Amino acid sequence: FFVDQGDKNWNFSYIDTSIDQGIATVTINRPEAMNALNETVVSQLGDALDLVNADDSVHTIVLDGAGKAFVAGADVKFFVDKIRADAIPDIVEFTANGHIVLDKLESSSKTTVALTTGLALGGGLELALACDYRIGTRRTQFRFPETSIGIYPGLGGSQRHARICGLPAARLACFAGEFMAGSATSDH
């Protein structure tokens, strides 16, 4: 879990990557926070995607989340701390970096698969929507919870959702902000 940074401090690694027979499995490993996205996770995920996208032996990228959630969205504590510190530019930078990471997934020449075994909320759902395929289980639940408090999906989720599932399903997901079971989403 720890990555040696040479002369620098040790950093905790939240992204585990393995390659087997051309399939790169990229696991977001922050189960204590339900794999919530923060600055470090987004940065490390971007680095991991750069590495596997550049590896000619890789033909498929599988995204997974450790523990009970795929990704439970953005880390709310990050936003609260930044707002309290009047550091709104940090939130803007985080969002811009999130767009870059999702664009790396969406534009990858590799086949991309989100293995959504558990919750895929907010930014986690947006991450899944940036992949070519989303595979769920009976435990899988999708939701844009931010819409229930008047915040729109900030990483392109409303646009990707409409392209993949159609406008009626995207409207339901974005306007209602309700949980959708994985089985229900297969209808869209």
Predicted regions and their residues:
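Phosphate-coordinating loops and pocket residues in cytosolic domains that bind phosphorylated ligands
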Residues: 36-39, 72, 81, 175, ...
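Conserved CoA-thioester-binding segment of acyl-CoA-metabolizing enzymes
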Residues: 1-66, 89, 100-103
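Crotonase-fold acyl-CoA enzyme core
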Residues: 104-188
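Hydrophobic/aromatic residues within transmembrane alpha-helices
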Residues: 26, 63, 75, 127-128, ...
